[in-house]
Design a protein with these regions (language model features):
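Short FAD-binding loop at a beta-strand-to-alpha-helix junction that anchors the flavin cofactor
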Residues: 1-2
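Internal hydrophobic alpha-helix adjacent to the cofactor/substrate pocket in enzyme cavities
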Residues: 6-27
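Mid-to-C-terminal Rossmann-like scaffold of FAD/NAD(P)H-dependent oxidoreductases
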Residues: 23-77, 81-86, 90
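Extended, charge-enriched "interface" segments that sit outside catalytic cores
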Residues: 58, 70, 75-80, 84-229
Length: 229
């Protein structure tokens, strides 16, 4: 709608104003962590001529930035910033513990292709053992089916099962995307000094120097994402 721009910037401004008063480190959400991070980075590195509208297509790591895992990505950060009330904090920590307990047992239990076939689960007949977490990632396999085979997998409720199943479906894609995120974070760790004089750097066109001076990127990664750089 465009209202996301004002709301998100207001939230981040409020958080960082409070941190500055307390002489604490600035809080930054990056592109791999949240859509707020994507938006702020776009506003800085690309600029806008109209209200910014948040589309999933703007995020290169959108498989990680899903609605179903927003609490897992961001609530811990909110707890660290003392933004989360105790009731919600305790509820989140309990959910996190339950998800971990289920995933741990799924990783410990394995199925060979022949064993899976006996239970009408279709996986590649390649002789490779797969963890139950991997098997759930297959189409038409859910937690109820796996519990019929392995009784030691805890039942923490439907909502936990749903989250585990979603995570399992995305697992293979996320493992590949994590390599891209690692590369992204590596560039984000290279801080550009605020005192840098771009006009003295050789090998850069006047246009690029002008854009860098205007945007004042904080990191190498941010500089790379400026249009035309």
């Amino acid at each position: 709608t465009g209202y996301e721009e004002a709301a998100a910037q207001g939230l981040m401004a409020g958080i960082n104003a409070a941190l500055k008063v307390k002489n604490k480190k600035q809080f930054i959400l990056d592109r791999s962590t949240s859509y707020i991070g994507v938006m702020i980075d776009d506003l800085i590195s690309k600029g806008v001529s109209e209200p910014y509208r948040m589309f999933t297509s703007r995020a290169e790591y959108r498989l990680t930035l899903r609605a179903d895992n927003a609490d897992q990505r961001l609530t811990c950060l909110g707890i660290d910033l003392d933004l989360i009330k105790d009731e919600r904090k305790n509820s989140f920590l309990e959910k996190k513990k339950n998800i971990l307990s289920v995933k741990t047992m799924l990783d410990k239990n394995n199925l060979t292709p022949n064993e899976a076939k006996k239970h009408n689960i279709k996986i590649a007949m390649d002789g490779v053992k797969r963890s139950c977490m991997e098997v759930i990632g297959q189409r038409n396999v859910n937690m109820a089916k796996i519990r019929q085979i392995f009784s030691n997998i805890p039942d923490r409720g439907k909502s936990i099962d749903n989250q585990v199943e979603i995570d399992a479906h995305y697992m293979g894609y996320l493992q590949r995307q994590s390599k891209d995120i690692s590369s992204f974070k590596k560039d984000e760790l290279v801080i550009i000094p605020e005192t840098i004089k771009y006009e003295t750097l050789s090998g850069l066109s006047n246009e690029v120097k002008s854009k860098l001076k205007k945007v004042k990127p904080r990191t190498l990664g941010q500089a790379i994402r400026i249009d035309g750089v």
